Every structure is written in structure tokens, then in C-alpha cells.
Regions:
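Residues lining hydrophobic/aromatic ligand-binding pockets adjacent to catalytic sites
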Residues: 1-133
Length: 133
């Protein structure tokens, strides 16, 4: 299985879908905590589900099991938690909940998975951590 992280932010639809096509993804796994507001643009949950099916002919799943804890995300976004502490807390949480094993049970049959996160020019995303664990 190949894992890729991709940001839903600061990207055009063209660039987003070109990357998915280059990776030949068969699953787009959305692990964002909040993916329904207008700021998400073309990557809002319902829109992204449609576009992934119609453009990429892949499966789209929003799975909050792999989202960060709301308090940790808030602390990171408000700069009261460093990236290193946030990434470590997220990894500990995944391990404590057995989420890594769940990931492979749920998605182990896919050959190329794009994990949707929220990285920007100014911040990293928990999707980057999930790809590595």
C-alpha cells in the first residue's frame, strides 16, 4: 500500500486532482476534523465525495477516527502547542486507541491512499503523521 498526504487548503482543484491521478489513488481518506464549512471550497465533504468518484473513479471516505483531538488541534492552531508536541500527542492518541491497526483493517485492501489533511504554508497537518505511523 502506498500512502500519500495531500492538503485540502491552499490548492486548486486542478492541482489537487492532478496529484491524485499521478498517484493512481483508489481511496481518498479524509481525516479532517472539520470538512463541511464553506472555507473548505471544493473539498467540502459532499463535494469532494462527488469529485473523487466522478473525476478520479476512486472511493472517498471521511473517517474521523483518524482526526486529532479537538483540544489538541485548537492548541496547535492557536500556537499554544508546538508542531512537535502536537504530532507526538496525535501519535500517542492513535496508538492508545488502536487506530493504526484499525486503519489497516479498514483500508488495507487499497493499493494507493491519499490522506486529506490541512497543511498550509504556515502549518503542518496530522495527515503527515498518519502517513508515517
Amino acid at each position: 500500500m502506498k500512502l500519500h498526504d495531500i492538503s485540502a487548503y491552499q490548492t486548486s482543484a486542478e492541482h489537487f486532482f492532478e496529484r491524485l491521478q499521478a498517484w493512481d489513488v483508489d481511496l481518498v481518506l479524509d481525516v479532517r476534523l472539520h470538512n463541511t464549512n464553506q472555507l473548505a471550497g471544493f473539498t467540502k465533504e459532499r463535494d469532494l465525495d462527488y469529485f473523487v468518484r466522478e473525476i478520479e473513479h476512486a472511493t472517498y471516505v471521511h473517517d474521523p477516527e483518524f482526526s486529532p483531538k479537538p483540544d489538541d488541534l485548537s492548541a496547535y492552531l492557536h500556537k499554544t502547542m508546538s508542531w512537535e508536541d502536537y504530532a507526538a500527542a496525535y501519535e500517542r492518541d492513535l496508538e492508545a486507541r488502536g487506530a493504526v491497526a484499525d486503519f489497516f483493517k479498514k483500508y488495507g485492501s487499497y493499493h494507493s491512499v491519499a490522506i486529506v489533511g490541512t497543511a498550509t504554508d504556515k502549518r503542518k497537518s496530522h495527515a503527515e503523521v498518519l502517513v508515517k505511523v
